[in-house]
Amino acid sequence: MLEQLKEEVFQANLELPERGLIKYTWGNVSAVDREKGLFVIKPSGVGYDDMQASDMVVCDFEGNVIEGDLNPSSDMPTHAVLYKEFPEIGAVVHTHSTWATIWAQAGLDVPAMGTTHADTFYGTVPCARFLTQAEIDRGYEEETGLAIVETFRERGIKPMEVPGVLLHGHGPFPWAKDAK
């Protein structure tokens, strides 16, 4: 099921360590098949050197595993919320890249500082608010997605004009039209 999408997601995940964007297994890429209402995501805790395309996990937007022998990334509920609420996006990435994670700890938006920034982000990159203890207790990963959606809706930001966000105290969640 979704073999081509699994391969694309697998290859995109392999780029994370190659580009120095992750430590250990702390990062993931997913991509969606809108016609089927399913997405493919990296499995949880699997080393990038040990991973194969067949290890990718197929999930629905409700967070159910549809296919796969491994557990999906612990960030899967965040990805599911983003796919449900932002139908224009086709792939989501989450890393703990050093500089973006450091910036996210401050809880500050990333201001547009020049044309290079504007090549990808048409405005300030927002930092979604810190989650409350009640939200964390309800389910950190799903609440993360909801806080991101809240940030974009409250600020009137279009997800494909500003294709990413920081989460206060956590790190970056960028997205794109596909995983390539």
Task: Outline where the language-model segments fall.
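Glycine-rich flexible loops
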Residues: 1-180
